[in-house]
């Protein structure tokens, strides 16, 4: 995959993630300077999960995010379209399901909450993915999307772009089994909607009352919304 865009081939993306599963968690921690752990905790806190609730963790990868969500006492299932990623996390004691974000293998109104972290960019048609997530969520259920976004401080934003396009690929070549995956990451982040535009897309595709919270100066934005209904 020579150049990333928001028009991506699902097979290419799945194959790319299959190749990075073994070192994925370590690579993310190194490249984010440890912030990935903070972002996972903040996602759990934002969802305000209750014991016994059913939660879908979509694009869960190795399920490290699912384990964090399960600390709430909720029943959480990890779903990802990369079998290699799920296999790399098979030692984690959480339910796992292989599934495509555009055709989820779950019945209507199955979950109290759905979350997707750093995976919405990778769904072939992310708008259809948002609608599919709404389909499997109960009326009144919650959505949280954690995604790389647009830094809110201009000077910091300039430094961040330099890091994405210059330093990140170099570090990835040292710590990742497939550095091309992180070149894709950098390019797809640059093509992604900013916070306001993504909130508009979420509200237009099955959800309502979308707002967001910036993390680490807007490197990550956490969008939250509700499925309309009782």
Curated annotation (Swiss-Prot):
It is an enzyme of class 2 (transferase). Pathway: Quinol/quinone metabolism; menaquinone biosynthesis; menaquinol from 1,4-dihydroxy-2-naphthoate: step 2/2. GO terms for biological process: menaquinone biosynthetic process; methylation. SUPFAM superfamilies: S-adenosyl-L-methionine-dependent methyltransferases (SSF53335). It catalyses: a 2-demethylmenaquinol + S-adenosyl-L-methionine = a menaquinol + S-adenosyl-L-homocysteine + H(+). Pfam families: Ubie_methyltran (PF01209). Keywords: Menaquinone biosynthesis, Methyltransferase, S-adenosyl-L-methionine, Transferase. S-adenosyl-L-methionine binds at residues 62, 80, 100-101, 117. Gene3D superfamilies: Vaccinia Virus protein VP39. Belongs to the class I-like SAM-binding methyltransferase superfamily. MenG/UbiE family. Methyltransferase required for the conversion of demethylmenaquinol (DMKH2) to menaquinol (MKH2). PANTHER family: 2-METHOXY-6-POLYPRENYL-1,4-BENZOQUINOL METHYLASE, MITOCHONDRIAL, METHYLTRANSFERASE. This is Demethylmenaquinone methyltransferase. It comes from Corynebacterium efficiens (strain DSM 44549 / YS-314 / AJ 12310 / JCM 11189 / NBRC 100395).
